[in-house]
């Protein structure tokens, strides 16, 4: 981490669009870094009042406006489909030299469209902090959410090397443990497996007809661990599943094949096959860098 880069952030003006779980966490992490000038934008007045009371933002607005002309960095922490609409409204106010980024869990054409919407001299560089937690909303936000997290920088050929490096350094200043650079198309394919599928599986497991008041008394750490992410923002995740439809459906088919393989081995009393299947899973789990 470049300490000099991090210290320079303290004098920059940040605008955070969307003060939910991730947006609120950005505000708190930036304040922890010593950033003195943070603007919060959200349609929810109560959230803005709470953030002001907490001292994590200095000004609050409900819509795009002239105040954005002061922002050196704009972080869009809103639904993927809302990013381009916001940028259309914000474009007349964004100053030359500003860096604009997002946190969207599905990229698709968003990075390309957003780059066309920002004014000349400003630059949109897409990003994705892998830093969620159970629950949603500003009340669940915390500065520590980025500590040790993976951060994905998702440039297009139109991005400058300077912007890519800026976002990488910014992620490290937040406390992220690893920064990866990848194309939007590859991002969506991999995220379908590492993020979309686990959330779908957790929701399916806890939505089983077997889930009941009585079954709750038979739940241990394993069930809690596997279903933790079923405490989900249903509106956001419906969008993420549908907008990444092709990749998600492909991963669901792959998962279905694994379940059918497991089912077949149990049905055939294939102990050797089961041991091999489970041992392979244990080995793969150990390969994950935590």
Question: Which sequence ranges carry the predicted segments?
Answer:
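NAD(P)+-binding Rossmann beta1-loop-alpha1 motif at the extreme N-terminus of oxidoreductases
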Residues: 2-64, 68-69
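Short beta->alpha hinge that forms the Motif I/post-I loop of the SAM-binding pocket
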Residues: 43, 78, 103-105
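Conserved short alpha-helix immediately C-terminal to the canonical SAM/SAH-binding motif I
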Residues: 46-47, 82, 107-110
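Rossmann-like NAD(P)(H) cofactor-binding subdomain of soluble oxidoreductases
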Residues: 88-139
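Internal alpha-helical scaffold of NAD(P)-dependent oxidoreductase catalytic cores
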Residues: 143-228
């Amino acid at each position: 981490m470049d300490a000099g880069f991090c210290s320079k952030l303290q004098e920059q003006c940040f605008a955070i669009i969307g003060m939910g779980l991730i947006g609120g966490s950005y505000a708190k992490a930036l304040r922890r870094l010593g950033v003195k000038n943070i603007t919060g934008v959200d349609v929810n007045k109560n959230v803005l009042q709470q953030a002001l009371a907490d001292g994590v933002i200095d000004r609050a607005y409900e819509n795009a406006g002239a105040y954005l002309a002061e922002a050196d960095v704009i972080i869009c922490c809103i639904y993927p489909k809302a990013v381009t609409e916001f940028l259309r409204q914000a474009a007349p106010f964004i100053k030359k030299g500003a860096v604009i980024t997002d946190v969207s869990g599905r990229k698709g054409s968003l990075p390309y469209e957003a780059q066309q919407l920002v004014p000349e001299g400003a630059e949109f560089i897409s990003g994705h902090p892998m830093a969620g937690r159970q629950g949603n909303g500003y009340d669940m936000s915390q500065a520590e959410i980025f500590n040790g997290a993976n951060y994905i920088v998702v440039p297009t050929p139109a991005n400058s090397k300077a912007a890519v490096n800026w976002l990488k350094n910014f992620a490290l200043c937040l406390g992220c443990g690893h920064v990866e650079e990848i194309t939007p198309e590859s991002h969506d394919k991999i995220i379908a497996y590492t993020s979309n599928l686990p959330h779908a599986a957790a929701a399916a497991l806890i939505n089983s007809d077997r889930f009941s008041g009585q079954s709750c008394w038979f739940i241990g750490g394993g069930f809690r661990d596997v279903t933790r992410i079923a405490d989900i923002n249903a509106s956001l995740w419906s969008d993420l599943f549908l907008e990444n439809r092709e990749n998600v459906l492909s991963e669901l088919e792959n998962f279905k094949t694994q379940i059918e393989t497991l089912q077949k081995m149990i049905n055939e009393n294939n102990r050797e096959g089961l041991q091999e299947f489970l041992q392979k899973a244990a080995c793969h789990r150990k390969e994950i860098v935590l």
